[in-house]
Amino acid sequence: MILQSPIIHHVDLLLVGGTLRAVATAWKLKQQGFRVFCITPFSYFGEDLCSTLDLFAPKGREYRELFGTGDSLLPMKIKHTLDRKFIDAGIDYLFQTHPVQIVYDRNGIPAGMLVANRSGFQIIAAKVILDATDRSLVLRLAGAPFLPFQPGVYPVDLNVIGEVACRPDLWIHPCEGTVADGGKEYPVVRVTKEIEFRENSPAALARAAVAIRRAVWHPDTVEIADRCRNFAKSAARDRPQRAA
């Protein structure tokens, strides 16, 4: 299939994914005069904290630089602050936009990315593409070699606000803080469940996510994270090579 898509931006750096470290990198490069554009499949930045409800994780240097504090913030504050950082810096971005294919120049050098969203397909021409996706999607699209996946039993973590089911196959780790809503304080816990993986395909990861979400549910559960954290992922080799 041949797609004729418009080139909507020419930039020095295209950021794919909106994790905290990636946002900090893009923001710093913009301050140095580079042209930066960002896309994320989510409807906000800070997806590594907000979509996982990882609110009480240790705060690193990027967190303190972006938010000016080491205190734990609620998702709405995180999203709003990162939005304002990009808007005030003049960084253009698109939410709910997915990487589709690497675009190459006549010499076979990566020159941008074909992306998709509700408006259709567009091309963003870029000298450098920074992959900040959960499963290294850009590297995979570029044909980078990955280490073979080793089937087996892997832990899957899911953060939950409120009560969780008491089951022998669940390990519950209370977080340091609580979340207040409507005058009530709710505990935040990280639940771990071991799940067997025969493969690490998107379908297998989705089945694991459904399994742990069903396992943790309790009538007094307040909120369950949109994403779980699983360790059944293959890593890229140390020196990925672009496919010919």
Predicted segments, located by residue:
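Structural motif
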Residues: 12-13, 128
